[in-house]
């Protein structure tokens, strides 16, 4: 089902605090210019966590209430950090500045407007789903993106926060679309899981300093990368963080993944399945690299030395004993088009170069266009097309090192 709409969170998805911190604004820094010298970072984090936890429990549905609650939050910050010597006037001034001076405190992430305009130009409808307060309307006016938006869903108006399903249902009702026709972009994986439960496809925004990819969702470091993902051009996930060498204990998961992948192929002839015994031999030889995300085997690949009689070079009659055969790559259907195939190609090339090998070889079904594109994008060259694997036709590829 074609997706027709994109919903966005605001904070660290489309917008950011100019100071780098939602609570420690420029006004705060002006009032307490030495706070970084006087207060240990861990102590500040703990104090902010207490104030933010209190804010999360408040019913903030008017600007006056927002101002009052923010003032109390800054009082709590001052009480927890006596080195600040925060006065009542300080708390009130910082809170009022945060509510009223949107331009000075918040900004769109670079490229946000252009990304939204691109999506609108492609016929996408756009909406916001945000845990936020009434001053958000001022922010959107200052950002100048209201004309690009078709729907607005705010936690303060509904009295619930993400990942409560009522947030997503409200947004979908405004759009008049099922979740299966929508994307949702947020920086928090828990919120993406809530949207996914209603059929939306999630993208994790990782623009915030120190953000780490969850792995279960495509990751975007910039608004433009969100557009790229929606257009099917991979994502910014660093798969090396999730890579492991597989062991005998992983064999059942390997077999299950092989079955899932084969069942999802457009043509079953694209892949020649292996037995568990064959996989066991490769695992025992230490040749199987996997991608594990939150305990789930998302993908694995196998590369073996190419010096034997059954090597791809030998099959083609090429005298190239110092080569590497890229034998298998399997990616769960849930993780397709996420750059994992290309990650394994780059990994095995790096290993082959470290061993001073002369070339890498692989075979691909000539009709398997996604795999062909991955190989050719990585600089592999087609040598020939011939029968292999019980009569199945395969294109043989080589990359010189």
Feature annotation, model-predicted:
Residues 186-190, 362-372, 389-390:
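Conserved beta-strand-loop-alpha-helix junction that forms the acyl-donor binding cleft
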Residues 1-6, 88-91, 113, 117, ...:
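Asp-based, Mg2+/Mn2+-dependent phosphohydrolase catalytic module
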Residues 164-169, 331, 337-350, 373, ...:
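Conserved acetyl-CoA-binding loop-helix of GNAT-fold acetyltransferases
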Residues 192-198, 342, 366-384:
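Conserved active-site alpha-helix within GNAT-family acetyltransferase domains
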Residues 180-183, 352-364:
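Conserved GNAT acetyl-CoA-binding A-motif
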Residues 300-328, 389:
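Conserved acyl-donor/pantetheine-binding loop and adjacent beta-alpha core of acyl/acetyltransferases
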């Amino acid at each position: 089902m074609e997706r027709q709409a994109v919903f966005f969170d605001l904070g660290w998805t489309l917008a950011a605090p100019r100071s780098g911190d939602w609570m420690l604004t420029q006004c705060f820094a002006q009032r307490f210019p030495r706070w970084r010298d006087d207060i240990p970072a861990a102590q500040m984090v703990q104090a902010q966590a207490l104030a933010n936890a209190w804010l999360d429990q408040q019913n903030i549905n008017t600007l006056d209430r927002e101002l009052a609650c923010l003032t109390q939050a800054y009082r709590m910050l001052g009480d927890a950090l006596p080195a600040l010597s925060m006065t009542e006037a300080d708390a009130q001034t910082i809170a009022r500045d945060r509510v009223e001076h949107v331009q000075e405190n918040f900004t769109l992430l670079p490229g946000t407007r252009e990304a939204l305009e691109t999506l609108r130009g492609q016929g996408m409808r756009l909406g916001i789903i945000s845990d936020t307060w009434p001053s958000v309307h001022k922010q959107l006016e200052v950002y100048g993106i209201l004309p690009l938006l078709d729907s607005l869903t705010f936690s303060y108006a509904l009295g619930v926060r993400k990942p409560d399903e009522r947030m997503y249902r409200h947004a979908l009702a405004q759009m008049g679309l099922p979740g299966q026709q929508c994307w949702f972009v947020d920086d928090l994986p828990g919120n993406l899981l809530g949207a996914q439960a209603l059929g939306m496809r999630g993208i994790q925004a990782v623009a915030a300093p120190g953000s780490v990819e969850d792995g279960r969702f495509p990751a975007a470091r910039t608004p433009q990368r969100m557009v790229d993902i929606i257009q099917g051009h991979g994502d910014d996930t660093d798969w090396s963080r999730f890579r492991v060498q597989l062991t005998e204990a992983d064999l059942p998961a390997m077999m299950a993944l092989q079955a899932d992948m084969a069942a999802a192929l457009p043509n079953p002839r694209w892949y020649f399945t292996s037995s568990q015994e064959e996989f066991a031999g490769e695992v025992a030889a230490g040749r199987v690299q996997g991608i594990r995300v939150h305990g789930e085997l998302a993908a694995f690949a196998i590369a073996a030395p190419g010096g034997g009689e059954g090597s791809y070079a030998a099959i083609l009659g090429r005298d190239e004993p110092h080569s590497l055969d890229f034998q298998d790559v399997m990616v769960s259907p849930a993780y397709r088009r996420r750059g994992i195939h290309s990650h394994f190609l780059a990994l095995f090339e790096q290993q082959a170069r470290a061993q001073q090998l002369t070339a890498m070889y692989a075979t691909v079904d000539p009709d398997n266009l996604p795999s062909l594109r991955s190989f050719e994008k990585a600089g592999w060259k087609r040598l020939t097309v011939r029968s292999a694997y019980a009569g199945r036709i395969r294109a043989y590829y080589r990359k010189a090192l």
